[in-house]
Swiss-Prot record:
NCBIfam families reported for this sequence: ispF
InterPro entries: MECDP_synthase, MECDP_synthase_CS, MECDP_synthase_sf
Keyword Lyase attributed: yes
Species whose genome carries this gene: Gemmatimonas aurantiaca (strain DSM 14586 / JCM 11422 / NBRC 100505 / T-27)
Protein's name according to its UniProt entry: 2-C-methyl-D-erythritol 2,4-cyclodiphosphate synthase
Length: 166
């Protein structure tokens, strides 16, 4: 008998660049900095994409959208996440829930949590109660504490399409 539920973990980090806004969780946060990257730098979408793909055994974001491909330069990370969700569905899986921890000194996540949850829930095809975004600081330690960038850890559960419970 095959498993009806799987779990995946995703991680991403980006250094900060000058100029805003900062794109996180599919929304723009007013800021004088942004997450530098080959795409739009949305570390939340990147970590969630990897968590989902990993749970389903479908590779990772770097395989789907290599940074060596010029077509991915500046790409909207929500589009990447939507593609991962489509791949998940094609393989017989659906999103169960997603739990996200953003490790950063700035920006503060709390004021933007509801908008991120709503945006991500729409993209993932789940209720907003199935998406949670937490913000944590690094207590001033290391590169995150020095406000050089941020890190994101995401955990996702996926369920076999057609299953409602375990």
């Amino acid at each position: 008998m095959s498993l009806l539920l799987r779990v995946g973990i995703g991680y991403d980090s980006h250094r900060f660049g000058e100029g805003g806004p900062m794109r996180l969780g599919g929304i723009d946060i007013p800021s004088d900095r942004h997450c530098a990257g080959h795409s739009d730098g949305d570390a939340i979408c990147h970590a969630v994409t990897d968590a989902l793909l990993g749970a389903a055994g479908l590779g990772d974001i770097g395989e789907m959208f290599p940074d060596t491909d010029a077509a991915n330069k500046g790409k909207d990370s929500v589009v990447m996440l939507e593609a991962a969700v489509s791949r998940l569905h094609a393989a017989g899986w659906r999103v169960g829930n997603v739990d996200i921890t953003v490790i950063t000194q700035q920006p503060k996540i709390g004021p933007h949590r509801a908008a991120m949850r709503d945006r991500l829930a729409t993209v993932l095809g789940v209720n907003s109660t199935e998406v949670f975004v937490k913000g944590k600081t690094n207590e001033g330690l290391g590169w995150i504490g020095r406000e050089e960038g941020l890190g994101v850890i995401a955990t996702a559960t996926i369920l076999a399409i057609g299953s409602s419970t375990l």
